Amino acid sequence: MIIVSKSCKNGNINRGTYISKEEQAINSVSKYRIIKDKFILNTTNMEMHIEYPSISDMSDIEKQERINKLIFLTSVGLYYNTYVHNKLKTSSNYTIVHNDDKYISVKYEGFTTVEARRPNYDCFCLNIDLIKGEVIGLEDVIDIEKLRVKFKKDNFTVVKGLDENIPLDESGWGELFDHYLEYHVISGDELHNYDFYFTDNKIGLIISVPVDAGGSYIILESSDNLSMDDIKK
């Protein structure tokens, strides 16, 4: 789980100082392009190498700036203000899971070392409504009770963290879903803004495992038995 300080939400990072742009458009659609940006910072306390996307060529420049600020504060700010005095080393990259004219869904993965301790694997997501220029929460697109009913082994594929050889019965999967709702990948993320991703027809869930239980993640993705239409609002 990543703990977020208030200062990160206020954007106290000079974006222009440490960012290099890779002038290679990826995932282009008719209304915008996605550019790969890199944030690199090396100081006595911090080593950060973070790749993240930015949007270009939107007709609404003000909205484009708002979206890019959201992306930057999530991609970089979560690490920067949390660990600024703790001898942080972090390396993170991203995958564009889905993008079209209306939405973009990004999954971030990387490793963080604090004060020369063992590296921790980090995983979180960011989903943005490109029409509104806002972050999408789980309940904006998914009916939680429908998802609860469909949250069964046959409907999900294990991407990471859960041994498929361990038999979880129906009640076990129910407990795992309750765990997903209770524990958050990002501290205080009651709306589950940062622990899911989606495509046209699939959803991925990132379940945070508490530090005292190993501090890792379980990542599940819906199988062909479960479509987004089955769990949409």
What label would you give each PLM region?
Residues 4-233:
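Compositionally biased intrinsically disordered regions enriched in Thr/Gly
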